[in-house]
Amino acid sequence: MKKISKLTTALALSLSLALSLLGPAHAAPDTSVSNKQNFSTDVIYQIFTDRFSDGNPANNPTGPAFDGTCTNLRLYCGGDWQGIINKINDGYLTGMGVTAIWISQPVENIYSVINYSGVNNTAYHGYWARDFKKTNPAYGTIADFQNLIAAAHAKNIKVIIDFAPNHTSPASLDQPSFAENGKLYNNGRDEGGYTNDTHNLFHHNGGTDFSTTENGIYKNLYDLADLNHNNSTVDTYLKDAIKMWLDLGIDGIRMDAVKHMPFGWQKSFMATVNNYKPVFTFGEWFLGVNEVSAENHKFANVSGMSLLDFRFAQKVRQVFKDNTDNMYGLKSMLEGSATDYAQMEDQVTFIDNHDMERFHNNSANRRKLEQALAFTLTSRGVPAIYYGTEQYMSGGNDPDNRARIPSFSTTTTAYQVSKKLAPLRKSNPAIAYGTTQERWINNDVLIYERKFGNNVAVIAVNRNVNTSASITGLVTSLPAGSYTDVLGGLLNGNNLTVGSGGSASIFTLAAGGTAVWQYTTAVTAPTIGHVGPMMAKPGAAVTIDGRGFGATKGTVYFGTTAVTGANITAWEDTQIKVKIPAVAGGVYNIKIANSAGTSSNVHDNFEVLSGDQVSVRFVVNNATTALGQNVYLAGSVSELGNWDPAKAIGPLYNQVIYQYPTWYYDVTVPAGKTIEFKFLKKQGSTVTWEGGSNHTFTAPTSGTATINVNWQP
């Protein structure tokens, strides 16, 4: 456990010495590797499996698919799961404070070598799946994957898999022999290909131009065979496949291309995960520079998964890499995103990845990367470091941003920044769960405070690498005392003296300087930091993490419904496990009261589902609208808004699968339940319901369905 930085009393020094003599403390439940729902205390390291380490040359592809020199970055280079195991066991990952790895999609990919514009391409990246129930042999066998899970867990590292259920592989409707025709296999059984698709496994609507959300969902991404999630075979297959990987012991899922799959189907997918073996899940929804998307926020708040925080990444790159914005822009991003995302602590922050040019380029000042990394590691959300960032890898867009890692040096400054700061996420709950407050700012300097209970971390960053800054008038929540820079001056930071009322002495923050000061203390009042998953049915398990819960069972509240006794399956000072009570579907606030009756803060936006979920396509014909009007769907279950127009599903689509005046939408609804519903038209605050009796429909118990009705005048 990280020691308290305050150095004012002999008692503190004696306590620190005693703790050091005791050795590593048993991990608190909320920080344990076994906590699959909460990654707020973790640092993720994203590994492009083929580009990391070749631990078993015997599984390398042969022939034109392989380039052992990694000169053609579109071919396999040899990285595999054994290579990752080796780097886990030699301490490279644990040495930089990594507690979770995100690996390439592990499923079997196509074996074809595809020639695009005279250049051979392979599925080295893992995104050209053929069988979601088998492994990619270039990465390893099922046994190798199980060994990876075991090796990671033995070193307190969680394992996240990339998962791309949007599509299979490249295909051409005009050339059935192109590549592998996008074929989908079910544990070796051929389910069908893109051409002669008699089972309707795929969409056949052409390629997306990205002009609308609907266009991006129901048309192909480039030449990738787009799976039809409204097909019961596809739906069941993908849900069974993820169950297989959950059974193998994964701790998290990164969902590829969530903007390009039906939102209702994805919510039913997450309900399946959460009701089976819930794990932390986050999706990829790309946002460009300065792009703020209400659809993106809504998805993160209601889908049951969080997102890669592109808004964070783009702003950090502007401020530290490109110098196209300043610290006020960074502050604005932090404040705006905290309002827009209901679970800010679950959004995954980063500075670069495999779909962006690398943060560092050969001519750049390395300090810019080091500061961006320090900012990410101490900011809200779950930080993810792209492999090789710690080695200052450079490279433009795909595939140059996916080169083989050049070395595994543990002495680079970037590696040391992670080594020193990553452990704070487990030792100081202010970093994992705390609020964020700006304490001092100008164009080049930002000093911000993270706080949880009386635990505090203060971070000062001067992005100007040429000019120091005199810091006067800084007030923090740190108790009076002297604080050492957690980085130990690695980024030219200084120590800090704080007087009464949190007032800091005047100091100079060096050019390009970054300092981190922190204080930890026990939290005595019950304080919730994290709840996961944030969506499940009654009877499912929910994990509540935080501090100050006490050792004796108290009460958990879902709204006004109290849960006590055997329905609380675990109660420790930092973690509670509870079964969702038999309440009606809807959104609830969660809070706890300890055994003495002291109430915690409220954690809001928890969705209780009405039961197991299935994806249903609702279609309404002849729904003509005036300019500015849109069609929505409401009904008798919480998943359809319980007849509340403000919570109605929509606006519905009318361009791709069906065309105006027919409207449609894929929605998750309770399986096997008879549902009443109607469509309505909305324009601003004006609502027009369709006439006649309510439509009635009984949802299937599994698979998918389509319900098609006419608008009732």
Curated annotation (Swiss-Prot):
Matches recorded under Gene3D superfamilies: Glycosidases (3.20.20.80), Golgi alpha-mannosidase II (2.60.40.1180), Immunoglobulins (2.60.40.10)
Compartments where found: Secreted
Cofactor note text: Binds 2 calcium ions per subunit.
CDD domains: AmyAc_AmyMalt_CGTase_like, CBM20_CGTase, IPT_CGTD
Disulphide-bonded residues: 70-77
Site residues by UniProt (Transition state stabilizer): 355
GO molecular function terms listed in the Swiss-Prot or TrEMBL record: alpha-amylase activity; cyclomaltodextrin glucanotransferase activity; metal ion binding; starch binding
Region (B): 166-229
Signal peptide stretch: 1-27
Any single GO BP term: carbohydrate metabolic process
Protein name: Cyclomaltodextrin glucanotransferase
Organism: Bacillus sp. (strain 17-1)
